[in-house]
Amino acid sequence: MNHAFSFMLAAALLAPATTLAQDTTTSAQVKRGEYLVTTGLCHDCHTPLIQGPDGPAPDMKRALSGHPQEIVVKAPAIVPEPWTGAMSPTLTTWSGPWGVSFTANLTPDPETGVLRDFTEQQFIQTMRTGRHQGQGRRILPPMPWPWIGKMTDDDLKAVFAYLRQIPAVKNKVPDPIPPK
């Protein structure tokens, strides 16, 4: 057997093992991210609710796609004292002293997903600082970034890895509406 063939055969046999180890690590990280997104209640706000036979239920066809673009909100809700906030029936729009906030599209849609331009590090910084991409506009209530930001780097990386591989949903979420 010539040496070039032996080298190519050895390389071919070793490559799948390396890829398999990387795939296993990535798969474990994505599974951890799915667990954290699910138990961290991300779907409660980022997955619109629809009315079903048993009342409101998550619309998993639009999982983590944020406020539905077809539901137009033009102004903050007028909330009587002593209340300080209101929410839409989909749980994707919140109104309070900060104005109106819309839950973001966390899917990897290349046109409308909010994380489309984020690096892993920017995602971590966003969760730590409460600022878009770690330095932009403030993330508005009710996003619990102060608590999510206490996750470990590994957990935040797992959440990011999971969000990068979920089905993309084209859904243009509106910009926040400032208070009056």
Q: Which residues make up each language-model segment?
A:
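Positively charged n-region of N-terminal signal peptides that target proteins for export
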Residues: 1-5
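Bacterial N-terminal signal peptides
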Residues: 6-16
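Electrostatic cytochrome c docking/interface patches
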Residues: 19-38, 50-56, 111-112
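The canonical Cys-X-X-Cys-His
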Residues: 33, 39-49, 159, 163
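Residues that flank catalytic or metal-binding motifs in active/ligand-binding sites
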Residues: 38, 102, 139
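N-terminal, post-signal-peptide region of Sec/Tat-exported proteins
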Residues: 43-72
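Electron-transfer interface patches adjacent to heme c in soluble/periplasmic c-type cytochromes
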Residues: 62-122, 146-156
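C-terminal capping alpha-helices of c-type cytochrome domains
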Residues: 117-133, 145-174
